Amino acid sequence: MPVDFLTTEQTESYGRFTGEPDELQLARYFHLDEADKEFIGKSRGDHNRLGIALQIGCVRFLGTFLTDMNHIPSGVRHFTARQLGIRDITVLAEYGQRENTRREHAALIRQHYQYREFAWPWTFRLTRLLYTRSWISNERPGLLFDLATGWLMQHRIILPGATTLTRLISEVREKATLRLWNKLALIPSAEQRSQLEMLLGPTDCSRLSLLESLKKGPVTISGPAFNEAIERWKTLNDFGLHAENLSTLPAVRLKNLARYAGMTSVFNIARMSPQKRMAVLVAFVLAWETLALDDALDVLDAMLAVIIRDARKIGQKKRLRSLKDLDKSALALASACSYLLKEETPDESIRAEVFSYIPRQKLAEIITLVREIARPSDDNFHEEMVEQYGRVRRFLPHLLNTVKFSSAPAGVTTLNACDYLSREFSSRRQFFDDAPTEIISRSWKRLVINKEKHITRRGYTLCFLSKLQDSLRRRDVYVTGSNRWGDPRARLLQGADWQANRIKVYRSLGHPTDPQEAIKSLGHQLDSRYRQVAARLCENEAVELDVSGPKPRLTISPLASLDEPDSLKRLSKMISDLLPPVDLTELLLEINAHTGFADEFFHASEASARVDDLPVSISAVLMAEACNIGLEPLIRSNVPALTRHRLNWTKANYLRAETITSANARLVDFQATLPLAQIWGGGEVASADGMRFVTPVRTINAGPNRKYFGNNRGITWYNFVSDQYSGFHGIVIPGTLRDSIFVLEGLLEQETGLNPTEIMTDTAGASELVFGLFWLLGYQFSPRLADAGASVFWRMDHDADYGVLNDIARGQSDPRKIVLQWDEMIRTAGSLKLGKVQVSVLVRSLLKSERPSGLTQAIIEVGRINKTLYLLNYIDDDDYRRRILTQLNRGESRHAVARAICHGQKGEIRKRYTDGQEDQLGTLGLVTNAVVLWNTIYMQAALDHLRAQGETLNDEDIARLSPLCHGHINMLGHYSFTLAELVTKGHLRPLKEASEAENVA
C-alpha cells in the first residue's frame, strides 16, 4: 500500500517550526516555571542553560528535539532567554558544539519530564488505536497521521521519523481492509459465491453484464417501470444475502465499498484478487438490494401521484365542459325555488305554480343532471381516479405479490385491505363484498359501493391505493428492509438504550425531567411577553388592531427599505474597484492554497493513492460540475493533470458526497476565522431557502410545478446560509415538497464548525409542529410569515387579562397533552439530536392528516406556545423583523451568485439519479463558498489598503458590505489552471491598479 500520502504542509510541519508561534502558544509551551528553572539551573554556562531550555520548549511544542538550534524562530529564542535573564542570545552558537551535550540533555529531559521513546508498549497502543479507527471508518491516512501525532504528543512519546509513522499507518489500514474483505467474502455459501461471480458475465438479452444492468435504476414513472424496478429488487433479493449478517461490520466502510462497486467497471472488479472481488460483490448486492427496493417504492409513490394528478386534470376538463349545463340547470332550479318564497302564493298551490313554470318531468331531469355533474365539497376527483383502473392493474399484481408491507397501529386498516387484495386480486370477481370497509371514507363511498350495495372491484382498488400512498408517506405502513420507506419509529432510542441515555439527553437538550416545571417556565414566558407587548402596542406605529372583519387581527406595516448612506456607496465602489479580476479556475486553486480543501478528496477505495497535481484535477472536476459544462472544455492533452483520462478518473474516484461535504466544511470554517466575516455575524444565525432547477431528462427524482418548471419537471436545492454568507448544508428535494419537512435537517446534519441556533425561512417552512421540534431541540425558529397578523395567538392562562391583545389571544393551549407525552417528546428529540433517525422521515410520520397521535398533538401544543412567543416578538420588534429580512436577502443574493456559476446547459440539471444530483449541487455549493471566501479575503485586504491610505472607514458601513459579487470573476471562455509564483507561496495577488486607488483616496 502506498506510504507517500502526506501533504506538503504535513511534511514541512512534522517536528519542525513553520513560523513564529503566537503569544498563546509561547505562553503554553515555552513558559518556564520555577521547577523548570531549577532543573535548567543545574547546567553550567548561559549557552547550556539556554540550549536545554529551548529543547524543553521544543519537545513540548513539536514533540521532538531539534539538532540545529538555528531552526528555532527568533521570537522563541528571545522569549526563553528573557525568562532566564540571558541578554545575549548569541551564546546559543556555543551550544551543542559537542554532540554528546545534546544527547545528554535529551536524555535528562526525557528522564525528568517522563518523555518516552516510540517503543513497546506505546507502539502497540498506538497501533491498536489506529486499527480501531481504520476499522470503523474510512478516514484519510493524512487525518490518521495527524491523530497519531497528537496522541504521541499527548502521551509524551518522542515523535518517530515521519516515514516510520506513515509506514505504520499504511500497514494498519491495509490490515483493517484485508479483515473487512475476509469477513465479507465468508458471508456467502459456495452456491451463493457462484451466483455472485455470474454478476460479472453478460445477461441473456443484453451485452451488458448483470452487474451493470442492476446498477441502472428506474428513470421513468409508469407501470412497466415499476414492474422492472420490482424485478431488479427481486434479482438482488434472490441472492439470499441478509443484512443482519453485517451487524458486526462497520457501516461507513461497507457504504464506501458498495459505492466503489457501483462506480468501478466490471473489468476492474474481474481483475481483483478473489477475496477482494467477492467482498466487493457482496457489498454491492447488500447495498443495492436496499437501494432497489427504495427506488421501486419511489416509483410507486410517484406513479400514484401522477394518477391523482391526471385524474384531477380530467376532472377539471369535465368540469369546464359541464359548466354551461350546470349553470343552465342552476338558473332553472333557482327560478323554481323562487316560487317557494312568494308570500302571496298559498302553500297548497305552490307545486302547481312551480310545475306550470317547469314541467314535472323537466324538473326531474334537471335535478338528475345536477346530481350527475355537481361535485360534493369533499370530492377529490376520485371518480376520475377510478377511471385509471386500466393503468393500475398492470402493476398492482407485482406490488401485492412481491412487496411485504408492515404497519404501525394507525396503519392496520390499510394493511388489512392490502392482505385482502393480495388474496383476491388474481380472481375475476367484479365485486369484493367481503372486503374490509374501514378504509372507505365518505368521499370514496359512493364510488366504491354501487346502488345495489356491492363493493366494486375498481372502486375498492383505487380507494386502497389512495389510502396506501397516504399511509406510506406517513409511515403508518412501511416496508422492512427499505431505507427511505422503513419504520422511523424503530430507529428511535428505546429500551435499555433509552434508559441508559435518558438523563444525558435531558441535560443536553436543556429540559427538566419534570414536565410541570417545563410548562411553568413556558407559561411564565408567554404571560410576561403578552403583557410587555400589550403595554407597548399603543406606541407601536407599525402594528394596528383591526376589528372590522369577522375576527380581530393585527395589521403589520411592511418594513421601509433601508437607505444606503453615501459613505456606504462610496466604500462599496472603492472596494469593487480594488478587487482584482480573476478566472474561476485560478480562484479555486488560490482558495486551495489558503485552505487545503483539496486534501479532503481521497480515493474511494485506495485512500492512500496520490498523484501529482491532484488539486488541479480536482479543481477542474469541481468547475465542470458546478458550472454545468462537463469535462470537455477543461481537457488539455498536453497537461498531465487535465487529460481526459485523468479527469474522468478523478471524477469517478474522488467526487462524492462525503468528500464534497468535508471540503466544504474547510471553506466554511476558514471563512469563520476572517475578521470581516466575524463583523457580518458570529455563525449563530442562518437562513434556509430553495433554488429551483429544471430537470429535462427522464428521472424519478423530480416533480412538477408549473410556477417554477413550466411544463417540465424539476428539483429544489434547499440550502442553508450562515450570517457569514457561507453555505453549510444543502438538500435535494424532488419537485417542491413542503420546506417544513426539511428545515431542521440542515441544522442537525451539517458537519461544519458553525453552531447555528436560530434559523430564518419563508412561510413555506413554518408549521406548529416545526416550532415544537425546534424548541425541543434547543433552536430558535424565526420564519418570515406572509400574514403574521392573521395567525392564531395561543394562551395558556384562560383567565389572564392581556388588555388590547385579549381579542387576538383566542387560542387555548392544552398543557395536559404535553404532560402525558413529555418523556416521549424528549426521547424523540434526543433520537433526532443523536442522528438515530432522519428528520424529514420522522416529520412525515408525525404529520398525519387523520387522527394525529398523542405525541404529535403534544409537539404541536408546544409549537403553538413557541409560535405565539415568536409572533409577539415579531410584532413588537422592528429590529427582529429587519434581521429576518436581512438574512433571507443574503440567501437570495447567494442564489444569484450560484446561478451565475451554474451557467451551462441553461442552468438545467441533467443527472438522472439522486446521487448525481446531490453531488453536482453539493459541488455548486462548494464552488459558491470558494467565491464568497475569495471575495471576503480580498475585501479584507482592500479595507486594510484603504486604511493604510488614510481613509476613515465607518464600522456600520463595513457591516453592510457583501461578498456576494461576481462581476470581476471570469466563469466563461479560456480555462487555465496556473498560479503566479507569489500566490503559490501563500501571498495575496496585488490589488487592482493600486496607484489609481491611491489617487482616488
Regions found by a protein language model. Give the residues of each.
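Short linear interaction motifs
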Residues: 32-41, 601-617, 668, 741
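Long amphipathic alpha-helical coiled-coil/heptad-repeat bundle
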Residues: 2-524
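Contiguous, well-ordered alpha-helical segments that form the cores/surfaces of helical PPI scaffolds
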Residues: 56, 159, 194-198, 205-208, ...
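Structured, charged N-terminal subsegments at the starts of enzyme catalytic cores
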Residues: 528-637
